[in-house]
A protein has these predicted regions:
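Enriched for short, Lys/Arg-rich terminal
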Residues: 1-9, 26-29, 44, 59-66, ...
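Acidic, low-complexity intrinsically disordered regions
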Residues: 15, 51, 94-95
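Short, solvent-exposed recognition patches
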Residues: 11-47
Length: 109
């Protein structure tokens, strides 16, 4: 089983968790949680690479929900951000920036 982690900003906020908490559609929330469970089992389903190490999981529900994540080591996934098709490019840009920030902070001594 893989490890699922959540990206945390320097101020302590967890963007993915905040996004999921404000979703009003209970069916969509259920599908999103199921997909995270699948990811833990190394079965992400409908997904594709975006750029610079960030991947997108697509959930066919509502406005086309997305989960942006990256691989941290062999068996760890870092959930960066959630969003939907309407803001896809801006969400990808933000996820890439946060992933880059995470990698840079990991390399600091």
């Amino acid at each position: 089983m893989n490890i699922i982690k959540y990206f945390r900003l320097q101020n302590g906020r967890v963007p993915f968790d905040e996004w999921l908490r404000v979703l009003r559609d209970p069916r969509a929330k259920t599908k999103i949680v199921q997909r995270i469970d699948q990811l833990a089992l190394n079965n992400p389903g409908d997904h594709k690479p975006c750029r610079q190490g960030v991947w997108e999981m697509r959930i066919d529900e509502g406005p086309g929900y997305r989960i942006y994540y990256a691989h941290e080591g062999k068996d760890t996934y870092l959930l960066l951000l959630g969003g939907d098709k309407r803001k896809q490019q801006a969400d990808i840009d933000q996820a890439v920036a946060w992933w880059k920030e995470r990698q840079e902070s990991e390399n600091e001594i």
